Amino acid sequence: MPTPARYLHRAPSDIPYFSSDGETYLAQTPLRDLKKSRPLRVLSEDDFAFWQSYGYVVVKQVIPAASARRLLDFAWEFQGLDPDRPETWYEEREYRSDLDRELHIYGFVEAYHHQLLWDSRQARRVHDAFVDVWDCEELWVTLDRLNLNPPNIKNRDRALIPRTEEGFDIELHWDVDTTLGVLPQRVQGIIALTDTRPELGGFQCCPELFRRFDRWKALQPDDRDPIRPRIDRHEFPVVRPEMEAGDLLIFNGLLAHGVAPNTSESSVRAVQYLSMMPALESAEALRRSRVESWRTLGTPDWNATLLGDATRHESLRYGRADLNELGARLLGLTSWSGADAHDETAPVGEESCAEFV
């Protein structure tokens, strides 16, 4: 989880969003209580009401199914796996660390800047969906990866990862500290590259806990786990939203969620991780690191779990992705004010002083 910082940057949006890291934000009004000032672009009124009540929403066909298929094919190719030969999915390999081993078990694909990933990021319908939930269009896109999860057996068996009694649990957790007095705002998302089926596992969540969170929280002990909920799953059912290839699922960071294992015989679950957050154009070091990552195909450094491919780094495989006008703004290459972000005199937001309380 990000460590709270005293000095925050304000996003260049009408709604005041503040953040030190571009992952979690302080806002005057929580997203679940936000009153829309902009007309909805993609979500219906019912979609938006569901999002605010239950903490997630599925947006149909934000990219064509054919584009999702190309991303799936790329995920296979990037890892040197043959979709028709399951024995290639479990070949022995060396690991750089325990984290590297866990990421392999969970199915992470260490590619961040291929053109196909950027095509999804700069798709207008994807941006419009995140505009709807944040109620602002001045957003940055996350520089994240893919996931290709074969059946969790052999050297991908989750039993190889020691279970813990507290803290992170892959099957159900929060990605923010839910014991804070002022809860941080965070939005996450995935684009399905395969249709969901129960045996494939994949994204699952607890929408009823989100809906009743304030009442539930008031009854919990002061020393409860901040990121692992202890719940009765009959009272708070865990569900797996249905998705088709090309659909986008957006979820609130305060929605308890996780990933169920793949228990199928020989099928895979695949997604692209993709979210958008209010741009922090005054956070110059952050902006420059994002642009440099795109320019050089360097592994992003915004999260310690992003490792880059150990066998052949993506910077050695293909060239820089082309960006359209929207993509340049979503990266931070161009300011949402219309100025070139290379110009250090350009008005690109402001730095603010605020406190977490």
Residue ranges and their predicted role:
Residues 145, 150, 174-176, 187, ...:
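Short, structured patches in soluble enzyme cores that scaffold and shape functional sites
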Residues 56, 143, 169, 184-190, ...:
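Extracellular structured ligand-interaction cores
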Residues 131-140, 179-183, 192-200, 212:
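Secondary-structure boundary elements
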Residues 2-53, 60-178:
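Non-heme Fe(II)-dependent double-stranded beta-helix
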Residues 3-8, 12-34, 81, 219-221, ...:
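Non-heme Fe(II)/2-oxoglutarate
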